[in-house]
Amino acid sequence: MRSDAIKKGHLKAPNRSLLRACGLKDEDFDKPFIGVANSYIDIIPGHYFLNDYAKIIKDEIRKNGCVPFEFNTIGVDDGIAMGHEGMLYSLPSREIIANSIETVMNAHQLDALICIPNCDKITPGMLMGALRVNVPTIFVSGGPMASGVTKKGEKISLSSVFEAVGAYEAKKISEEEFKDIECSACPSGGSCSGMFTANSMNTLCEAMGIALEGNGTILALSKEREELLRKAARRICEIALDERFKIRNIITQKAVRNAMVVDMAMGGSSNTVLHMLAISREAGVALDIKDLNFISSKVAHIAKIAPSLNSVYMDDIHKAGGVSAVMAEISSRQGHILELDALTITGESLEERLKNAKIKDENIIRKVDNAYSKVGGLAILFGNLAEQGCVIKTAGIIGERKFKGEAVCFNSQDEAIKGIIKGKVKKGNVCVIRYEGPKGGPGMQEMLSPTSLLMGMGLGADVALITDGRFSGATRGLSVGHISPEAAEGGLIGLLKDGDEIEIDVDAYTIHANLSEEEITQRKKEFVLPQKEVPSRWLRMYQKLVSNASKGAVLDME
């Protein structure tokens, strides 16, 4: 056993003495040691109950002949961190989470790992850390919350509240309606109820085979979710010493491809691109951002979920057959785009896992021949504005897929919010928010507040927004993010001026500023990088080491 390094032989008597102080007995030193990586924190609605979930898992591990050791990672709630300097810390928290998993697991030489994530950066951070450790691993998330319901009976989610801010600013809703939306949108614990980043990543864990069926869709705080926890705990005990189930044997090139197929079919958050690039790097798997358009071109968008479709939420997807039903439909209708021989954590191939899966409600999960779109719900655009690529969630577009307009430039998200409220962004404009990339922020803030303001003010179908920052999974509209190279590293987005004409063609995968090469060269000569004070030592360290979004915004020591 890997854990023999801390428990076997007379030289390890001091180690055992400390373990005995934790309650271990003689017989425990012959059992596998299982790390239980929790992410319990009171301030995140998807995490405040995870201490109870960890108890369920630990009890089941003990019943099945292993010894659990619970430890915790940090967590940041993107919704609460939104709209102020707290958002600078969201993406960097992913690296802290990854480092903490690696540190605890390797410092104590635990044999296997079960991770309990749920929201935002916690799932990708845990995946990255687990891949570095490379022991048998299972992910079981806390689960999505139920959708909210207003007094009028309308189903809503957190994104509805952000958009209500814009509607209230524009005097389109009353104070009473505004309050009702605020108080109704998040009715229970769990990750936010739509296909936002948290649910996207928990769904992709299922698609990659590192989580059991239902991981992405079974509601939080339900008896069904508790049984999933027990099943995951039993399974980690069964495979704790089986090298076939080391996480790098599960998250392979095939698994990563399957994740991106499901991402396209379900219109996942644009953040998944950033995270899957980082996860692939830790797995030693090649994933080039340029490959994603090929996958998108081969995969129909068959499940549309809030915020893209405000009548459908994660619990609806579960009732309609879940992620397995989506994958089964894609595999039966779209050739060999899915890698059906990929190994899952149960020991089954993906094909075996899907053999009984079927769509139970075609109004929720559509057949391929009745898809929302013949291509996937994400696209990568290239052009002189994004030579290394940028990302758009095509599933969230509500207006035209081709757009031409004059730039209105802002050098920060805060500046943009003030400008939008003052009416500086008008119908037909391209709102440009720059110096918000991984280095420029630093931290690559989410632009949910600006996009939601535009939606709430009735401009969502008539304005495009481009940024070197990123978007919440709750964003909709013609919103282009992750522009690389970013402004802080000399990207063209930093050279734009108010009035410059910008063209976006989603179906042609292009984004272009209509400037001559001579004009661009002249602007580069005149360009002076704005200086931004970064008082935080951690953020300065992050700024120095982080790559741009086209590489996953990873810390790069090379």
UniProtKB/Swiss-Prot annotation:
Query: So what EC number does this one have?
Result: 4.2.1.9
Q: What does this protein do?
A: Functions in the biosynthesis of branched-chain amino acids. Catalyzes the dehydration of (2R,3R)-2,3-dihydroxy-3-methylpentanoate (2,3-dihydroxy-3-methylvalerate) into 2-oxo-3-methylpentanoate (2-oxo-3-methylvalerate) and of (2R)-2,3-dihydroxy-3-methylbutanoate (2,3-dihydroxyisovalerate) into 2-oxo-3-methylbutanoate (2-oxoisovalerate), the penultimate precursor to L-isoleucine and L-valine, respectively.
Subunit organization: Homodimer.
Q: Which domain of life is it from?
A: Bacteria
Regions that span the bilayer: none
Any keyword Amino-acid biosynthesis? Answer: yes
Name the gene that codes for it.
Answer: ilvD
Its UniProt entry gives the catalysed reaction(s) as: (2R)-2,3-dihydroxy-3-methylbutanoate = 3-methyl-2-oxobutanoate + H2O; (2R,3R)-2,3-dihydroxy-3-methylpentanoate = (S)-3-methyl-2-oxopentanoate + H2O
Any keyword Ligase? no
* Residues annotated to bind Mg(2+): 78, 120-121, 446
Per UniProt, the keywords (alphabetical) are:
2Fe-2S, Amino-acid biosynthesis, Branched-chain amino acid biosynthesis, Iron, Iron-sulfur, Lyase, Magnesium, Metal-binding
Q: How is the cofactor bound?
A: Binds 1 [2Fe-2S] cluster per subunit. This cluster acts as a Lewis acid cofactor.
Annotated InterPro entries: Dihydro-acid_dehy_C, DihydroxyA_deHydtase, DiOHA_6PGluconate_deHydtase_CS, ILV_EDD_C, ILV_EDD_N, IlvD/EDD_N
Residues recorded as bearing N6-carboxylysine in the entry = 121
What NCBIfam families does the record point to? ilvD, PRK00911.1
Which pathway does it operate in?
Amino-acid biosynthesis; L-isoleucine biosynthesis; L-isoleucine from 2-oxobutanoate: step 3/4; Amino-acid biosynthesis; L-valine biosynthesis; L-valine from pyruvate: step 3/4
Provide the residue positions that the database annotates as binding [2Fe-2S] cluster: 119, 192
List the molecular function annotations (GO) for this entry: 2 iron, 2 sulfur cluster binding; dihydroxy-acid dehydratase activity; magnesium ion binding
Please give the name of this protein: Dihydroxy-acid dehydratase
